[in-house]
Amino acid sequence: MEKFLKYEIKVNNNQPTNTNPNYGIFEVAPLESGFGITIGNAMRRVLLSCIPGASVFAIAISGVKQEFSNVEGVLEDVTEMVLNFKQLVVRISDLLFEDGEMIEPPLERWPVLKVTAEKKGAVYAKDLECPAGFEVINKDLYLFSLQKDMKLTVSVYVKQGRGFTSFLENRELINSLGIIATDANFSPVLHCGYEVQEVKTSKQKLTDHLTFKIATNGAIKAVDAFAMAAKILIEHLNPIVSVNESIKNLTIIQEKAEERKVKSFAKQIEELDFTVRTFNCLKRSGIHTLQELLSKSLTDIREIRNLGKKSEREIIKKVQELGLKFRS
């Protein structure tokens, strides 16, 4: 069968000065015509909905029973406080996971991020105390302000997941009064767009140039999210390929002819499966790679000491099998 083009990936090619790991531009080319949209659409859907992340799913504020209330001495009402806490970006260590899922203990033993404010002034995410394995990324996030010296404790419950869960679903995890369930948006990918450009490579040949632009919330690097999306797709498609073992082992993508040629030239003569006598003769004459062999003319080959007619024929046959020629 006709092989598909082997493509290359360039990272941040258009912005060489970009050092923000939360943003990335990824160029994939050359792709067969039509594959830009096929790959782009599949990757975008996975990036926006399937990359795992962490999110706040419940909050407890000392002295507060439900979210539609006020706390004396606090600038914000409870609803505003909840909205602020929902913007927390948290990373959870892989050490707290087993088989890809967080081990979820009862809520009373759940790891809690906690802040206790006692003096008048603003409270930020950096003031949160985190349990082992939890890290707040956006430490400058404003949470609330005390209008006088007083003591207020806020406990924040965070879990790992994919996609989105509503406060109704999260409320099922809560078994005590005074804990307010919230919606949870787990996706660490804030934006993912792609663009496909047609590139004319010959009079009759068009290829696709696919460009992704990805932005994350900092819990995962853009390049890691990009790779994770591809991994998720591959893992879902592999079982389908396994339906037919002969197709499973089929080579679908092939390098360009000139790339294969360059790689062939770099081959050591040990890789060409010559007989011991032929191999030793070539080594003694200072020929170590295929490129060095092809730099010789047929006359040069025949003049190699102790080569013999049989070894000469073996070398000529091997070069012909590779579709290559000696120097004329």
Curated annotation (Swiss-Prot):
GO molecular function, one term: protein dimerization activity
Any Pfam family: RNA_pol_A_bac
Catalysed reactions, as listed in the record: RNA(n) + a ribonucleoside 5'-triphosphate = RNA(n+1) + diphosphate
Region spans: Alpha N-terminal domain (alpha-NTD): 1-244
GO biological process: DNA-templated transcription
Region of interest (Alpha C-terminal domain (alpha-CTD)), ranges: 261-328
Coiled coil: none
Keyword terms of this UniProt record: DNA-directed RNA polymerase, Nucleotidyltransferase, Transcription, Transferase
SMART domains: RPOLD
InterPro entries documented for this protein: DNA-dir_RNA_pol_insert, DNA-dir_RNA_pol_RpoA/D/Rpb3, DNA-dir_RpoA, RBP11-like, RNAP_asu_C, RNApol_insert_sf
Enzyme class (EC, first level): transferase
EC number annotated for this UniProt entry: 2.7.7.6
GO cellular component: cytoplasm; DNA-directed RNA polymerase complex
HAMAP family: RNApol_bact_RpoA (MF_00059)
Function of the protein: DNA-dependent RNA polymerase catalyzes the transcription of DNA into RNA using the four ribonucleoside triphosphates as substrates.
Domain notes: The N-terminal domain is essential for RNAP assembly and basal transcription, whereas the C-terminal domain is involved in interaction with transcriptional regulators and with upstream promoter elements.
Name by which UniProt lists this protein: DNA-directed RNA polymerase subunit alpha
